[in-house]
Swiss-Prot record:
GO MF terms, alphabetically ordered: 2-oxoglutarate-dependent dioxygenase activity; iron ion binding; L-ascorbic acid binding
EC code(s) of this entry: 1.14.11.-
Residue ranges of domain Fe2OG dioxygenase in the record: 78-178
Requisite cofactors: Fe(2+); L-ascorbate
Free-text cofactor note: Binds 1 Fe(2+) ion per subunit.
Residues the entry annotates as binding Fe cation: 96, 98, 159
Name of the protein in its database record: PKHD-type hydroxylase BP3529
One GO process term, biological-process aspect: DNA damage response
Alphabetic keyword roster: Dioxygenase, Iron, Metal-binding, Oxidoreductase, Vitamin C
Cell membrane as UniProt keyword: no
Transmembrane helix among keywords: no
PROSITE patterns per record: FE2OG_OXY
Pfam families xrefs: 2OG-FeII_Oxy_3, PKHD_C
Amino acid sequence: MLIQIADLFTPAEAAQIRARLEAADWVDGKVTAGYQSAQVKHNRQLSEQHPLAQELGGLILQRLAANNLFMSAALPRKIFPPLFNRYEGGEAFGYHVDNALRPVPGTAERVRTDLSATLFFSEPDSYDGGELVVDDTYGPRTVKLPAGHMVLYPGTSLHKVTPVTRGARISAFFWLQSLVREDSQRSLLLEMDVAIQRLNQDTPGHASIVQLTGVYHNLLRRWTDV
């Protein structure tokens, strides 16, 4: 399941965030990579302890909590604090799979990376390359979204970022642990949730809506991992 979430931030908001990030101090992106990933990771990141990273990360979490599509698709239990990266001058991140577990800095918490997310802050016409390529059962899927838009995809996916040959690609990225760890089960629940919402719009008050909602919650009860 690969889900695009539009307009988490407006273009104007994304531009303001991008301007603040462009002026920040960046460090080698290998600091958050595992051993294998570090071999193919060539980018820069904002330090996890940087005040700007913490401020913007908190703002992203607020927007996510208010986004119905995100909440329905992800069914989040834990969200790793968002990180920020920058690619330019040929920088890229070769094919890799994200670490299964991420310790949350400064806590005893660990987040199982059921889902990965990239939130774009650079407009796609402002840089060449920098596509996120996610391999799934249907083959490679290429993602390059407008500023303020986000993509959500399974943490089990093999993926890469192609070299940025012009301009700079600035984005946020993070992982989350879902209440439902299996991607196929989350996909079914999302389809059912969307169908129930459409039925509510088309035939409000229909008795079948209550029955279908009960089926949704019984499946969620069966599959939830808390």
